[in-house]
Amino acid sequence: MNPSSRFLKLLNIHPGEWPLVQKLFSLQFFQGAGIALFFTAAISQFLEKFPISELAYVFIISAFLLWIAGIVSNKLEHKLSLQKLSVVMTLIMATSMLFFWLGEFVFSGNWFYYIMLAWFNVLYLINNLEFWGLAAQLYDVRQSKRLFGVISSGDIPAKFLGYTIALLAIPFIGTQNLLLAGFFGMLFSLFFNLKQFSHENKKSKSVSYYLS
């Protein structure tokens, strides 16, 4: 569905830019909602089992996990194309959410909940690296000044929706199953990820054909 020219003008979006803006906004929206659901499940279960003073250890664990995630991300950046890197990052986030959901049936130690809550920070890092890496490559400097605020705004309603869904859904599905809901949200974002590259590939082919 194409928005009205008045709406595009209000957001300072040129008509030809709307398809990509829409896909990036949707990507950020569903990933943000998935991470919000994951965080709700992780923090709720952690505080149910441990005093708030234990959060200090979570931050220490987070520091090590973020360091490792940064190294791995840097290695992948040099080995994979932008498209493959983005898909791999999305799959890592989705798979990790599924792992923690399954892990609650398998692992009984307290350490598991420390790792799960610390992993939220890793998810947030990967999401930002993926999204802004895509945006920086797909837009030039002039476009970025106009559009970065628009495409990144998907994160705000995503968090609102994610936390609202968590509040309403917990009495019916339980806190643990929010992890599974987050997994599906992250997996659905993959659709917009692949769709945006399909759009860019078609655009590149048409430009190449015109130039030839």
What does each model-found stretch correspond to?
Residues I71-Q83:
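A short N-terminal interaction module
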Residues Q31, L65-W67, I92-G103:
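A generic, lipid-embedded transmembrane alpha helix
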Residues L20-S73, F112-I170, S208-S212:
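Substrate-agnostic recognition of the 12-TM MFS/MFS-like secondary transporter fold
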Residues L98, F131, E200:
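Short, basic/polar, glycine-containing "phosphate-handling" surface segments that engage DNA
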Residues M1-F25, I52-S53, L80-K84, L91, ...:
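Intracellular loop-helix junctions on the cytosolic face of multi-pass helical membrane proteins
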Residues K75, A94-M97, L134:
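Generic beta-strand or strand-like secondary-structure segments
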